[in-house]
């Protein structure tokens, strides 16, 4: 045991040798002592090693095929969007590695620029989930922002720098790590210019926000208020370089298909309209033929579109895809609710026609995959309320009638054990 002095009553740190009078705190272990200063030093070393381990390394970065296969385990359908995202993300992190490792003049002569991503598609088709799954696989900081809350600087609402604050918070305020993260900006179609022609009045939540986003999308040294909110001159700012931040912006872009139809020679309205059934319209990829001029006509400014060179479109989910979403992914809803019932000692079963009926309702409501959970909650609410208070239920079976006609799920009673039968007969 480490002691100082003739009396042997003055303890000292076993690592740095400082006495208990020279440090704030001395913690005892079996035969050893450690001071608060050595503990702080150990924490710093561990944090540095963890930060180094979390960095995305090129030799460890999954190839586009592997990225797509990983997405397949969580997201059903949207094959074109998966391929586009896989290639774009792989190239983005290759570009970061090339910037860090290029030292000879030949490599430095070629500067690889950033390719941000624009995702188009109806609500509930997996745009946000695709981006979240990507970030999970790559182990990089990931932040989601809502474009509808943003306004031009000086007006009521959020500044665009608050988006960067969310990314810094996701990286535990490690700015270096945040500078290689991913930011997903949703509802970007809601900041479209209110009219195709420039207006005399300021459009502070539309074109003004697009203008404010230009610099951070392209790459700039931004000053971010550490507590969020508006900037004021008496506060410290966090400096972050957005050059290597990958931006994925997404929106439903309702009405864009009519603009595309007009351009390619198909009339969307009137006597010359091409007549198609609703089923055909729902399963058609409206945005496969989108061009920059369509987005400009919709209300995005040319400078904004130019900073989003990669376009990935997602399609409406058909009935077959929704049924697969319910049961096949690793965290499918059926598996989630089955696990919830297992915790109460009850087995849960969905018939095939019940899953099809749930998919039909989601299509009818127009909510896509996002509406599946709401339907499941409605169907299972009565039994989820009663079952925890009962010990005579072995199994719950959800049928087509349960979904369509609000009939209670079939409850299979549990057979009493031998001891329970003996007690009952006694």
UniProtKB/Swiss-Prot annotation:
UniProt xrefs under InterPro entries: AAA+_ATPase (IPR003593), ATP-dep_Clp_protease_ClpX (IPR050052), ATPase_AAA_core (IPR003959), Clp_ATPase_C (IPR019489), Clp_protease_ATP-bd_su_ClpX (IPR004487), ClpX_bact (IPR046425), P-loop_NTPase (IPR027417), Znf_CppX_C4 (IPR010603)
Keywords, comma-separated and alphabetical: ATP-binding, Chaperone, Metal-binding, Nucleotide-binding, Zinc
Gene Ontology MF terms in the entry: ATP binding; ATP hydrolysis activity; ATP-dependent protein folding chaperone; protein dimerization activity; unfolded protein binding; zinc ion binding
Stored Pfam families: AAA_2 (PF07724), ClpB_D2-small (PF10431), zf-C4_ClpX (PF06689)
Domain annotation ClpX-type ZB: ranges: 1-54
Protein's UniProt keywords contain Nucleotide-binding: yes
Binding site for Zn(2+): 13, 16, 35, 38
List of residues binding ATP: 122-129
GO annotation, cellular component aspect: HslUV protease complex
Biological process, per Gene Ontology: cell division; proteolysis involved in protein catabolic process
HAMAP family membership: ClpX (MF_00175)
Family stated for the protein in its record: Belongs to the ClpX chaperone family.
Function: ATP-dependent specificity component of the Clp protease. It directs the protease to specific substrates. Can perform chaperone functions in the absence of ClpP.
Quaternary structure, from the entry: Component of the ClpX-ClpP complex. Forms a hexameric ring that, in the presence of ATP, binds to fourteen ClpP subunits assembled into a disk-like structure with a central cavity, resembling the structure of eukaryotic proteasomes.
UniProt-recorded name of the protein: ATP-dependent Clp protease ATP-binding subunit ClpX
The organism of origin for this protein: Mycobacterium ulcerans (strain Agy99)
Gene it is expressed from: clpX
């Amino acid at each position: 045991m480490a002691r100082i002095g003739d009396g042997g009553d003055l303890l000292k740190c076993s690592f740095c040798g400082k006495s208990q009078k020279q440090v704030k705190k001395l913690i005892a272990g079996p035969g050893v002592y450690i001071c608060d200063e050595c503990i702080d030093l150990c924490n710093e070393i561990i944090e540095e090693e963890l930060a180094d381990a979390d960095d995305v390394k090129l030799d460890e970065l999954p190839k586009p095929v592997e990225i797509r296969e990983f997405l397949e385990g969580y997201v059903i359908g949207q094959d074109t969007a998966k391929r586009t995202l896989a290639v774009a993300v792989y190239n983005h992190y290759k570009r970061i590695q090339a910037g860090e490792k290029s030292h000879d003049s030949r490599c430095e002569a070629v500067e690889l620029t950033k390719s941000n991503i624009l995702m188009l598609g109806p609500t509930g088709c997996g745009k946000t989930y695709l981006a979240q799954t990507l970030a999970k696989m790559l182990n990089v900081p990931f932040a989601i922002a809502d474009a509808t809350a943003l306004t031009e600087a000086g007006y009521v609402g959020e500044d665009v720098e608050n988006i960067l604050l969310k990314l810094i918070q996701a990286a535990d305020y490690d700015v270096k790590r945040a500078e290689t993260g991913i930011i997903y900006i949703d509802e970007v179609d809601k900041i479209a210019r209110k009219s195709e022609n420039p207006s005399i009045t300021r459009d502070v939540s539309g074109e003004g926000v697009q203008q404010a986003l230009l610099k951070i999308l392209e790459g700039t040294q931004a000053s971010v208020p550490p507590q969020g909110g508006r900037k004021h001159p008496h506060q410290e700012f966090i400096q972050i370089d957005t050059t290597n931040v990958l931006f994925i912006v997404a929106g439903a872009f309702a009405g864009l298909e009519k603009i595309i139809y007009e351009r390619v020679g198909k009339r969307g309205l009137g006597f010359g309209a091409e007549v198609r059934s609703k089923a055909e319209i729902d399963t058609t990829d409206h945005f496969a033929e989108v061009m920059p001029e369509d987005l400009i006509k919709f209300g995005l400014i040319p400078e904004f579109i130019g900073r989003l060179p990669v376009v990935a479109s997602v399609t409406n989910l058909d009935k077959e895809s929704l049924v697969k979403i319910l049961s096949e992914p690793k965290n499918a809803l059926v598996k989630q609710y089955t696990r919830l019932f297992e915790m109460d000692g009850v087995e849960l079963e969905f018939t095939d026609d019940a899953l099809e009926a749930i998919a039909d309702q989601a299509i009818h409501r127009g909510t896509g995959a996002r509406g599946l959970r709401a339907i499941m909650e409605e169907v299972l609410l009565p039994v989820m309320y009663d079952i925890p208070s009962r010990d005579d239920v072995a199994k719950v079976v959800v049928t087509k009638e349960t979904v369509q006609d609000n009939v209670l799920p079939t409850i299979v009673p549990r057979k009493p054990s031998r001891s329970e039968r003996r007690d009952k007969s006694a």
